[in-house]
Amino acid sequence: MIKTASTRDLRYPIGSGHGSDAIHRDPVYSYAVTLLADDQGNIGSGLAFTLGGGTQLVCEAAQFYASHVVDRDIEELMANFGSWQKLMADEQQLRWLGPHKGVVQLALASVTNACWDLWAKSRGLPLWKLLLELTPRQIVATLDLSYLEDELNRVQALAILNDHATTRIQREGLLATGYPGYDTSVGWFNYGDEQIRENCRKALGAGFTAMKLKVGSSDPERDLRRASIVRELAGNDVRVMIDANQQWTLPQAIDICQMFRDINPFWIEEPTHPDDVRAHKILADSILPMKLALGEHVPNRVVFKNYLQANCAGFIQVDAVRVAGVSEFLAVSLLCKKFGIPVVPHVGDMGQLHQHLVLFNHIAMGHPVIFLEHIPHLRRHFVHPVQVEDGVYYTPQEPGASCDLK
């Protein structure tokens, strides 16, 4: 039985140019944390990611949503969690502040993730193992698929999971080998050229075979120079991603993306405003065969549906600490599977939670193994930080979702 709910506003200034991009020049990596304590001594910890200011607003909303799950048994709650999540999301007064976006959506993510963490801990299982032990019907019961019915209803979601159940054993070897990562910290926006060179060498030495560079400068030639540095040092066999963090207008994006053709980027990420599906479609068609990656700032399954329907995303970067937590992440992953688009999450959680989810996506849904973003800057603050060696995420074994903070 869940006995108490509380929140924490945790902020971690990281400085030294770490985490900087074209829009967010001086981020303070922060979490709105929901803590759910049960009568057996377990504490579920749920995260929503912010950049500092406003975290207290998310905590206030999370406290409100968490009141809906207090005095409820975690097994009974999660047996029909999709309905409970919809009930919370549709609370009429807070819904007006969204719907399904902004502060209220982040708050719902925090509470939802705490529920999943508590469920896994109460069973003594790491989250990935809990997910894999649930039947397809139990998984679907945790999802709110409203507004997806034109593309993905409950019968179709169940069919995707059932269709891949018989071949799961062929994909379970990933649990032993680990999930490949990519280094997103090679080229933060405020880093100088020499620091980028040094970081590239370190990433290659650490076993990474993919890395990312932040672009979006007022002078595109700076971006091209930095990208050329990464490609020259990394060589042609390493995947290099370019991330503009929404900095460009559509006309700018069309022109600047062409400049990167010789760099051969694996993707170009967040080129323009995340709500502008049509702009992404025009851009995607104009820069082929280069591909777009998007989703870091997409707040809900409906907008992801629109992007998939528009056929403009080469990779979907849904983040379980921005959408409504694990449940909506799984709904979006099922939707992506239907459309044949790979999920490569953004990791506002620093990979702590998503290391579990990508294992489930591959084993239970047959999503391809590409890689998972790795950001090291908050490692010392987690009780069980991710274990990445030779560029690979080792499979976590501790009960829960790996989201406990010190």
Features from the language model and the residues they span:
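Conserved, mostly hydrophobic/aromatic
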Residues: 2, 41, 65, 111, ...
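Shared catalytic-loop signature of beta/alpha-barrel
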Residues: 258, 264, 273-404
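Metal- or metallocofactor-binding catalytic centers and their adjacent structured scaffolds
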Residues: 37-145, 149
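Predominant activation on well-ordered alpha-helical scaffold segments within soluble catalytic domains
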Residues: 59-66, 112, 116-117, 128, ...
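Metal-dependent enolase-superfamily TIM-barrel catalytic cores that perform enediolate-based chemistry
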Residues: 145-282
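Flexible, glycine/charged-enriched surface loops at secondary-structure junctions
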Residues: 77, 127-130, 214, 267-271, ...
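Structured beta-strand/loop patches that form or line metal/cofactor-binding pockets in enzymes
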Residues: 1-53, 379-381
